[in-house]
Amino acid sequence: MAVPKKKTSKSKRDKRRATWRHKAAVEAQKALSLGKSILTGRSTFVYPTAEEEDEEE
């Protein structure tokens, strides 16, 4: 079974965790922005709005 040879330093560990957390924060912000856009009806690229559905029928 593969095991690490040496203990990872705290600074290296903290850098990696900071990177992961930053990436997660960026993705969360994108998700919130997309959700707000959909809820306010400003998005035209995800779901068709109710007005467009009425025109098609």
From Swiss-Prot:
This is Large ribosomal subunit protein bL32. GO terms for molecular function: structural constituent of ribosome. NCBIfam families: rpmF_bact. PANTHER family: 50S RIBOSOMAL PROTEIN L32, CHLOROPLASTIC, LARGE RIBOSOMAL SUBUNIT PROTEIN BL32C. It holds the Pfam family Ribosomal_L32p. Residues 1-23 are annotated as: Disordered. InterPro entries: Ribosomal_bL32, Ribosomal_bL32_plant/cyanobact, Ribosomal_zn-bd. It comes from Trichormus variabilis (strain ATCC 29413 / PCC 7937) (Anabaena variabilis). The gene is rpmF. One of its GO terms (cellular component) is large ribosomal subunit. GO terms for biological process: translation. Keywords: Ribonucleoprotein, Ribosomal protein. Belongs to the bacterial ribosomal protein bL32 family.
